[in-house]
From Swiss-Prot:
InterPro entries: Ribosome_recyc_fac (IPR002661), Ribosome_recyc_fac_dom (IPR023584), RRF_sf (IPR036191). CDD domains: RRF. It is found in: Cytoplasm. The gene is frr. Keywords: Cytoplasm, Protein biosynthesis. One of its GO terms (molecular function) is ribosomal large subunit binding. Belongs to the RRF family. This is Ribosome-recycling factor. One of its GO terms (cellular component) is cytosol. Responsible for the release of ribosomes from messenger RNA at the termination of protein biosynthesis. May increase the efficiency of translation by recycling ribosomes from one round of translation to another. Transmembrane segments: none annotated. One of its GO terms (biological process) is cytoplasmic translational termination. It comes from Pseudomonas putida (strain W619).
Length: 185
């Protein structure tokens, strides 16, 4: 029972870390990275498709992404989708290849993205703490129902707190790395 609660808490906290990683990856830095375009949807074959399903996105150099459409007829739609996205990117097309240069970040945009990253990290911490709260409530219920002793509850609560501290430290480390990346000129 206690192990099930701890395992569930660890799994849910791990999912919060994974979500944090995805959210931080979508925040643009000065460097080109294919995940920047993950949010771009392209009108293709009668529906909105994610860009990575209709084209191959690769890094050409440190500041340029190269996009090759799987279907050459989609090149114009891909270019338009990137232009109309709220990413502030300006693609240029050369036949079936689309190049997306990454504009240099101004000090103001760097600080804005750092604030955004901080908010994402704080949301992840809140999610981890909510998991801890749920796990502690489950332990209290087991104690109340006399399924475990108070000593076992206290021991398990300490282990869950250590788990929470470990995941919060991971979140802080991920944020610090992203912040360093954003503030590097």
């Amino acid at each position: 029972m206690i192990n099930d609660i701890k395992k569930d808490a660890q799994d849910r906290m791990g999912k919060s870390i994974e979500a944090l990683g995805r959210n931080l990856a979508s925040i643009r830095t000065g460097r080109a990275h294919p995940s920047i375009l993950d949010s771009v949807k392209v009108p293709a074959w009668g529906s909105e498709m994610p860009l990575n399903q209709v084209a191959a996105v690769s890094v050409e150099d440190a500041r340029t992404l190269k996009i090759v459409a799987h279907d050459k007829n989609l090149s114009a739609a891909i270019e338009k989708a990137i232009l109309t996205s709220d990413l502030g990117l300006n693609p240029s097309s050369a036949g079936t290849t689309i190049r997306v240069p990454m504009p240099a970040l101004t000090e103001e945009t760097r600080k804005g993205y750092t604030k955004q990253a901080s908010a994402v990290a704080e949301d992840a911490k809140v999610a981890v703490r909510n998991v801890r709260r749920d796990a502690l409530a489950d332990l209290k219920k087991l104690t109340k129902d006399k399924e475990i002793s108070e000593d076992e509850e206290r021991r398990a609560a300490d282990e869950i707190q250590k788990l929470t501290d470990k995941f919060v430290a991971e979140i802080d480390a991920a944020f610090k790395a992203k912040e360093k990346d954003l503030l590097a000129v």
